[in-house]
């Protein structure tokens, strides 16, 4: 649901959400220590470009062979990304603990709170299940990207075989066949990418509260991966678009992080995550208020 119904879903003041994040960061100047490890992984991931390891000639091979080459190229970056997600969730857990108990001292050690024997297995399974669900929703988009690369490969191959390009005889059978095949692949790729994003983006925001709910559930000793994902979907009904708007407001900070090759993440990552935590707490208050108003047990 991409719109906000006033009666059912009270609107969240995003300006207040960002202000709360800035205030908390100002009150805790050593907060960057909690996000030191995930920030370092952000910098590392910026130097990982799996596309450089994929030769375009691979596209001539059968689909399963192409999938194998792509999987090998992306395996290490995906592993780094997943470790970064676990570290970031652990940092969020430490931040939530700090919000509850201001006497807690921010440190790098606190950011490893979810790596103990009791919490790590539930954290790992929950985040892995979230990744798997989002991967399933991204399949149309991934197929569209594959067809887009393949159509680009066909175009380059055709130009290589016809150095007289673009001065071609458009009436020739070979040219007509190429234009038809290229057009079909290119059109199919655009349709799949557009439809894929329409399917994927709402699901991305539906599961956006998983990490915060996981931290909350771990304290209660009730960290069931499926239940956490289901609760996140329930929480975000009526709030997906507001979260999307919040991400748009954070876009300049994402851009600043990108142009500094991730170095700015030491300062930006704590602010961005505190903003998302403030948003989560606002959604949680709204959800609890709604439950109590309807006399439903939580």
Give residue ranges: language-model regions.
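Hydrophobic alpha-helical membrane segments
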Residues: 2-298
């Amino acid at each position: 649901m991409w719109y906000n119904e006033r009666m059912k879903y009270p609107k969240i003041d995003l300006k207040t959400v960002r202000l709360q994040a800035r205030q908390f960061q100002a009150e805790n100047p050593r907060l960057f220590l909690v996000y030191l490890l995930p920030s370092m992984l952000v910098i590392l991931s910026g130097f990982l470009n799996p596309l450089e390891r994929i030769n375009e000639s691979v596209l001539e091979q059968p689909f399963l062979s192409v999938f194998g080459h792509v999987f090998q190229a992306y395996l290490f970056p995906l592993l780094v990304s997943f470790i970064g997600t676990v570290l970031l969730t652990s940092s969020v857990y430490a931040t939530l603990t700090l919000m509850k108990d201001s006497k807690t001292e921010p440190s790098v050690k606190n950011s490893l709170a979810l790596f103990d024997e009791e919490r790590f297995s539930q954290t790992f399974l929950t985040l892995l299940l979230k990744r798997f669900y989002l991967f399933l929703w991204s399949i149309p988009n991934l197929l569209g990207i594959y067809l887009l690369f393949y159509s680009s490969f066909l175009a380059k191959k055709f130009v290589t075989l016809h150095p007289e390009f673009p001065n071609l005889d458009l009436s020739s059978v070979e040219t007509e066949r190429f234009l038809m095949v290229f057009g079909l692949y290119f059109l199919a790729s655009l349709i799949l990418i557009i439809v894929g994003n329409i399917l994927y983006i709402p699901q991305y925001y539906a599961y956006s509260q998983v990490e915060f709910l996981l931290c909350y559930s771990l304290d209660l000793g009730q960290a069931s991966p499926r239940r956490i994902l289901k609760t996140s979907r329930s929480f975000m009904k009526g709030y997906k678009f507001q979260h999307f708007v919040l991400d748009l407001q954070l876009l300049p900070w994402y851009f600043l992080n990108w142009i500094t090759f991730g170095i700015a993440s030491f300062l930006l990552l704590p602010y961005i995550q505190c903003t998302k935590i403030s948003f989560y707490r606002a959604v949680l208050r709204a959800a609890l208020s709604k439950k109590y108003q309807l006399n439903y047990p939580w």
